[in-house]
Every structure is written in structure tokens, then in C-alpha cells.
């Protein structure tokens, strides 16, 4: 049983990644993101997921530094934005993110979106950074199967992680199976469906276990082998989201949640975005 917040999965290169972390999408730079990260670290989180596009890497880095937690105990993820695809641009973007975070390295660096015709050259830069030991693991975000095939057919380094929109209404079963087949860890962004949790099936399971629908969804992630990074700016909610290690969903619970899949996206389709 997955029993504590510091439990990890082992990525395809041997690096250990916490099964749960804090996401900071749409968390404002400055006091808000610093307070959010500080609350999470105080609550026992050791994984923080940011991105260049979020505009809050500086605040994340400041909160990490002020926490006093040894760097070796933390797992920090950031992502390369779409404007910085290409070999040289990606190298510069990586350096810029490190400078903002105030870190010597990140644990996981992701290509945020698969910009058509550009992501392969970017992956070449990622491989360079990885081989030089400047990143502990490299991965992608929002990659469909055909995007992953492009990378797998072109390069020796298999992405360690694919971070995708994934939740009970968008379970991504085919993509998850492909990732499992190739040793790519799936990570869920927007695991709580941007607040669309008012579903009778979730309410029933939550009542059964004395938990909230959000906690049920996060437990479903964990028991499905999915790394999850719920976002919140409220300390009470950050603590509540982490309170999912004292119960277990049974087979009927898991089946009921799996049956909610409708292929419903709340975010952009990686094959059809214009940013």
C-alpha cells in the first residue's frame, strides 16, 4: 500500500520521484507562490512542479532556499516554454530557469508542449544537458503517442516522464498503456479536473471512506501508478490533498472511477493549440 507522502516511483534511469507533489500553475509570482510552496514543504511535500511559462520560478526558488530543507531531499521540476524550442534556444532556456530558481540543477526538465516541427531539436538539447549531468531526468509534457514515437524513433534516451492532462473524466488509457510499455512514467496535471468534482460516483466513494471527492481522485491516481501534482494556494487544502495515505480504494471503487472516463478535456489538445 502507498502509505506516505514521501513514497517514490523509480524512473527509467533509476532516479526516484515522489508520487505526489505540489503544482504551481496559475499561482502568482511573489508572496502567493512563496506561501504555497512553503506550506507544502511544511506539510511534508518534497516535490514541486513549476514551469518557465508560469512566471513563478523565482518565488519557488526563494521558498526552497528559505525552507532550509537539504537540496538532496527535494525533487524540482520545471519546463521549457514553446518560444524556446530548438537546440541553442533550449540550452539558454534551461540556464535561465536555473538562474531564476537559484538552483544548480533541476531533477526533472520537461518539454512543455510538442510544438510541431521543433520538439526533436529540443530533445537533442535535452539529451546534451542530461549527458552532461545538468539534469537528473528529462521528459515531456502533453505528448500524444505519435509525438512519443517521433522521439523514440529518433533518439536513444527515452523520456522519463510524460506529464499530461489526466483525471477520471479523461483517463488516457491508451496513452498510459503506451507509456507503460516503454517505461515512461505518467504524471497527471490538473488531476482535480479544475474543480469539476461534483460527480455522484465520487461523492458516494468519498462518503464511504470519510474523505473528500478530491482526496478520492488523488488516491485513484496513486493506486493507478500515476504521479500527481495537485495545485492549491490554500494551506488547508494543501494539507488535505496530502491526507490520502490512510485509506485504500477497493476494486469496486476503482472500477466505478474508471467508468467515469468520457475523454473530456479541460485544457488544450496537444494536436490543436496555438500558443
Question: Would you name each region that the model predicts?
Answer:
Residues 12, 61-73, 95-104, 128-130, ...:
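Acidic (Asp/Glu)-rich catalytic clusters
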Residues 29, 114-267, 271-275:
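Beta/alpha (TIM)-barrel catalytic core signal, keyed to glycine-rich beta->alpha loops juxtaposed to Asp/Glu
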